[in-house]
């Protein structure tokens, strides 16, 4: 049986009022600060969650924060690949990307998915602008090679999977200054103009670092980081994370997510959280309430 996840309708009027009152100190604290949000998973698929996310981002902007959205699109890419008879292959949480897959990734992320997010935010009264790594030289990338765990010293070529060489934040800052909400697709480009598929978690983490973000929030399809017994780990340090990597608790798609979150924390991002994007208005609950939510990542 599918577990019921709460919606805004489940919250009593009194609790709603208490939440609004509770939000004031957080609004003051984050006023004028950059909040980077990695948006992905079910929150990008279910209509009610898509709408609640758009409204949340708009509210953050209206109360004086500077939200920057970095989106994924794994399910949409998988669906597009399925239509042309291809299946996704992942190594260490990274999608192996041949030339044909790269074309699909560019079309899905830079077109279909991004346009949907931008249009929804604009529909509800916000001002969103979509960007890829090519716009304003935002994300310069190079080919990523990952370590071959079965062959010490060896590497694995993932195709057109990229790692970030540099980020030019000028275009993002210009949009923020003009009251726009940047929506960034995780596609980078080399100096020669070659497009690369970059894991969205890595882009979000590096964007938070370069923009000197106050907060990085990563939305997932689970309550946060779980131990091997399925218990939520609400607070993790670098040392604890190393242990979870070593014993295999953190694996697959969580590898780049946790690595990126930890790197952001080490780089000076004051608050890094991994939260359950399946809960309606989870973004506001994380940023504007006292309630512990998801997993907080700390550098020490």
UniProtKB/Swiss-Prot annotation:
It holds the Pfam family AA_kinase. Gene3D superfamilies: Acetylglutamate kinase-like. GO terms for molecular function: acetylglutamate kinase activity; ATP binding. It catalyses: N-acetyl-L-glutamate + ATP = N-acetyl-L-glutamyl 5-phosphate + ADP. Substrate binds at residues 73-74, 95, 197. The keyword Kinase applies. The keyword Amino-acid biosynthesis applies. Its EC number is 2.7.2.8. GO terms for biological process: arginine biosynthetic process via ornithine; L-arginine biosynthetic process. Belongs to the acetylglutamate kinase family. ArgB subfamily. HAMAP family: ArgB. Catalyzes the ATP-dependent phosphorylation of N-acetyl-L-glutamate. This is Acetylglutamate kinase. The gene is argB.
């Amino acid at each position: 049986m599918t577990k019921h996840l709460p919606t805004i309708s489940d919250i009593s009027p009194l609790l709603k009022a208490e939440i609004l009152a509770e939000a004031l100190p957080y609004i003051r604290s984050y006023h004028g600060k950059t909040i980077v949000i990695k948006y992905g998973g079910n929150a990008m698929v279910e209509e009610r969650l898509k709408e609640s996310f758009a409204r949340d981002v708009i509210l953050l902007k209206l109360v004086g924060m500077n939200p920057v959205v970095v989106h994924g699109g794994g399910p949409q890419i998988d669906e597009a690949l399925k239509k042309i008879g291809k299946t996704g292959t992942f190594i260490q949480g990274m999608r192996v990307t041949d030339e044909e897959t790269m074309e699909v990734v560019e079309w899905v992320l830079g077109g279909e998915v991004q346009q949907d997010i931008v249009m929804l935010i604009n529909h509800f009264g916000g001002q969103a602008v979509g960007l890829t790594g090519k716009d304003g030289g935002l994300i310069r990338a190079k080919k990523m090679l990952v370590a071959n765990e079965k062959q010490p010293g060896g590497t694995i070529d993932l195709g057109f999977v990229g790692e970030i060489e540099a980020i030019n934040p000028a275009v993002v800052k210009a949009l923020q200054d003009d009251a726009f909400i940047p929506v960034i697709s995780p596609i980078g480009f080399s100096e020669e103009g070659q497009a690369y598929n970059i894991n969205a978690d890595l882009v979000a983490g590096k964007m938070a670092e370069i923009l000197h973000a106050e907060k990085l929030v990563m939305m997932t399809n689970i309550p946060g980081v779980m131990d091997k017994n399925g218990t939520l780990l609400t607070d993790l340090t670098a040392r604890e994370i190393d242990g979870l990597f070593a014993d295999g608790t953190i694996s697959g798609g969580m590898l780049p997510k946790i690595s990126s979150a930890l790197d952001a924390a080490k780089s000076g991002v004051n608050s890094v959280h991994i939260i359950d994007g399946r809960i309606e208005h989870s973004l506001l609950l994380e940023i504007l309430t006292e309630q512990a939510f998801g997993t907080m990542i700390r550098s020490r």
